[in-house]
Amino acid sequence: VKRPMNAFMVWSQNERRKIMDQWPDMHNAEISKRLGRRWQLLQDSEKIPFVKEASVRLKHMADYPDYKYRP
C-alpha cells in the first residue's frame, strides 16, 4: 500500500515536470529545493485545490486504519 501524498506532493508532481521540461539537466536535489521555495511563497488560497486533493489521505486512512509508513 502506497503512502498517500500530502498537498505539497500533489502540487509538486506537476511542477516538477514543468521544471524538468525547461531544464532537463538540473539535478533532482536542486529541483526539490526550488519546489520547496515556490510552495512556501504560494498564498494559502492558491494551495486549497492541492489540500483538497490530498484529502484523499483521509479516505486512505479510513480504508487502511492499521497502515504504518515504512520507508
Swiss-Prot record:
Stored Gene3D superfamilies: High mobility group box domain
GO biological process, one term: negative regulation of transcription by RNA polymerase II
DNA-binding region: 1-68
This protein's GO CC annotations: nucleus
InterPro entries: HMG_box_dom, HMG_box_dom_sf, SRY-related_HMG-box_TF-like
Name of the protein described by the UniProt record: SRY-related protein LG28
Top-level division of the source organism's lineage: Eukaryota
Keyword list, A-Z: DNA-binding, Nucleus
GO terms, molecular function: DNA-binding transcription activator activity, RNA polymerase II-specific; RNA polymerase II cis-regulatory region sequence-specific DNA binding
Xref: Pfam families: HMG_box
